Regions:
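Transmembrane beta-strands of outer-membrane beta-barrel proteins
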Residues: 44-52, 136-138, 186-190, 247-249, ...
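Outer-membrane beta-barrel "beta-signal"
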Residues: 460, 596-608
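Solvent-exposed loop segments that connect transmembrane elements
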Residues: 63-106, 149-161, 211-220, 261-325, ...
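Residue-level signature of outer-membrane beta-barrel architecture
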Residues: 124, 128-130, 177-179, 239-241, ...
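Short loop/turn motifs that connect adjacent beta-strands in outer-membrane beta-barrel proteins
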Residues: 32-46, 59-61, 116, 126-136, ...
Length: 608
């Protein structure tokens, strides 16, 4: 009876739906570098930023997002997928309690008003210039969190504790050469680097996906934008074919994936993805629905994890009440590359871009093996899996419409990975009919199917003051200027089977939609030299709304999901910076695993 759910929504590893651009405001960007060298020799600069930050929970866990053994009140078998796969029809079993029971450690570990992060961190950068057009950059970051492992229910496992409390990361490390190729300016860069293509600002899933992200860093108070993107070992080039036409390309030497939140930490939304991952434990309601009376033999009369059942991990696995972790199957290091062609149409002051990328998935899926006894619904183990050899085609544009910077992009993925739960469907041993989506028939499931995906994005950036159309706002509120950013995106999976036959994965086992869309806005005002202090104060609001439709993998949209962040940012001559943030999540029903994770945070940093 070793069945387990897919955890592919852990792909989302949700983080606040705020502008990554805003991180540049929240964190300190060092401007007071120590410079050295001469014009004709080696010259360079050393930049460092030290920061301290904290974050505290503002609400108690919501029972709809917890396993029912842990005080939850989730939907269990009352779900859309269960209308197709259910015990009464004898063709499958979709009980969402197994999803929430294996996704709530981070939620249960911190109570309302708990300080879940108290972090001291630093970023250090060395930039060099030498010779004829040579340059180099090295950047490292470290962090020490004093509160993340102060948990209420489940101790952080060794790898999770190390990742959550002590980090040292090598970020950029590259060497570049600028030169002329005939009459064409060129540049080649080799080493750990970040490449940003496309036009998106806030919404993920478009063209800008060359580099993986570090979600733990995103969730760390005081994070700088350049720390969030994980540099990848690549060789890249740019070549100015004409004054208006530019060619760019890259080849990635080694694959790296998303860094997801360690299991049991505050923003972790999957107990089997990330450092500290553990076995999948079957909750009482799930087991009793299949085999009544099974859990009565445990010390507590319940199934679930060791704390709930009173049985050890080994006992649970041996009795078929848990499924062990079977390892990570990483993609190959080769086969990732891309080309970009940019054309500046000067007559209309608009840049157009064409893009192609060959890539491997950077976000994890959950695969399964079921070879020992599939007719008894035995799953041998689960493994972390990634799709390989994917293609992305994209176009973009950027221009000015009056004082407003407008940009947009359209991307197409002919074989996007869409998560399924192949343990929901019973195999032919029980149904008499072969089901290609059932791991009990295939023996091994990679945990996803492939679908065509389109995503379109349009965004605008507007800064205003005094006599501008929106200048009355800063004038009325005593500010010098303001800024407004807005983005709308839509995702389309034209071939998605919404009948329920394909067991797509969402936390509550509802079915995803072919079309989904949403928007994000950011608004702020600047008050320079407030009260003659030399401090620029910036109040800022960020709001996101997933308006209609839920995307497969719950990324980027979950219908009805919203978030709001109110920030108050301080900048004293680009040396001292700080901020206070209040973050609220709501909407999206039981698919919004962040709906009860409201928090407040603050940080202060010093750059030198």
């Amino acid at each position: 009876m070793n069945r387990l759910p897919s955890r592919a929504w852990a792909k989302a590893a949700p983080c606040p739906a705020l502008a990554l651009a805003a991180l540049g405001l929240l964190g300190a960007q060092p401007c007071q570098a120590v410079t050295f060298g001469s014009e004709h020799g080696i010259s360079g600069s050393v930049d460092s930023t030290l920061s301290y930050g904290f974050a505290s929970r503002l609400q108690s866990p919501d029972c709809h997002l917890l396993g029912n053994d842990n005080g939850g009140c989730n939907t269990a078998t009352h779900n859309e997928l269960g209308r197709y796969y259910n015990l009464e029809r004898g063709n499958g079993y979709a009980n969402a309690d197994i999803n929430y029971s294996n996704a709530d450690d981070g939620n249960l570990n911190y109570h309302k008003h708990d300080v879940f992060s108290q972090v001291l961190k630093g970023t250090h950068e060395l930039s060099l210039r030498f010779g004829e057009g040579w340059s180099a950059l090295g950047r490292v970051a470290w962090a020490r969190d004093f509160k993340m492992d102060d948990t209420r229910r489940t101790d952080l496992e060794g790898p999770a504790r190390r990742d959550a409390t002590q980090r040292f990361d090598l970020l950029d490390l590259w060497l570049a050469k600028s030169f002329d190729l005939g009459d064409m300016p060129a540049k080649v860069k080799v080493g750990n680097q970040v490449i940003s293509w496309g036009a998106e600002l806030f919404v993920s899933g478009g063209i800008n996906q060359i580099n993986a992200l570090s979600l733990p860093k995103y969730h760390t108070p005081g994070t700088q934008l350049k720390e969030v993107f994980i540099p990848a070992p690549m060789a890249s080039f740019s070549l100015g074919l004409t004054d208006a036409l530019n060619l760019e390309g890259y080849y990635q030497f080694k694959w790296n994936g998303y860094d997801v939140d360690p299991v049991g930490t505050y923003f972790s939304s999957a107990d089997i993805a990330g450092e500290g991952r553990r076995a999948i434990y079957y909750p009482t309601g799930f087991v009793e629905g299949l085999q009544p009376g099974t859990c009565a033999g445990s010390p507590t009369g319940r199934c679930g994890d060791p704390l709930t059942s009173g049985l050890s991990h080994e006992q649970l696995v041996a009795s078929g009440l848990a499924v062990p972790y079977g390892g990570e199957r990483k993609p190959g290091n080769g086969g990732q590359y891309g080309l970009a062609l940019r054309w500046m149409a000067e007559s209309i002051n608009t840049e157009f871009g064409l893009f192609y990328q060959r890539y491997h998935d950077k976000l994890p899926f959950i695969g399964y093996t079921a070879r020992s006894n599939p007719d008894a619904l035995v799953v041998d183990d689960y493994f972390i899996n990634y799709g390989e050899d994917k293609d992305l085609f994209g176009v973009s544009m950027s221009t000015l419409v009056g004082p407003v910077a407008v940009a947009g992009e359209l991307s197409f993925r002919p074989h996007d990975s869409v998560a399924i739960d192949p343990t929901v469907a019973f195999g032919q041993g029980l149904t008499g009919s072969y089901n290609r989506y059932s791991v009990f028939d295939t023996g091994v499931s990679k945990g996803f199917v492939e679908q065509r995906k389109w995503q379109a994005d349009v965004n605008a950036t507007y800064t205003f003051s005094g006599n501008d159309p929106l200048g009355f706002i800063p004038n009325a509120l005593g500010a010098s200027d303001g800024f407004l950013l807005a983005e709308v995106a839509v995702t389309r999976y034209p071939g998605l089977d919404t009948s329920g036959r394909v067991p797509y994965v969402l936390p509550d086992y509802s079915l995803p939609d072919r079309t989904s869309w949403g928007y994000v806005t950011e608004f702020g005002l600047n008050y320079p030299n407030l009260f003659g202090s030399g401090v620029t104060v910036t109040p800022q609001l960020d709001f996101s709304h997933d308006v209609k439709g839920t995307t497969p993998n719950a990324m980027p949209f979950v219908e009805g999901r919203r978030s709001l962040t109110a920030s108050l940012l301080f900048n004293h001559r680009d040396r001292w910076k700080g901020g206070l943030q209040w973050v609220r999540y709501w909407g999206g029903g039981d698919n919004n695993l962040m709906a009860d994770r409201d928090f407040v945070s603050g940080n202060i940093s010093y750059s030198f």
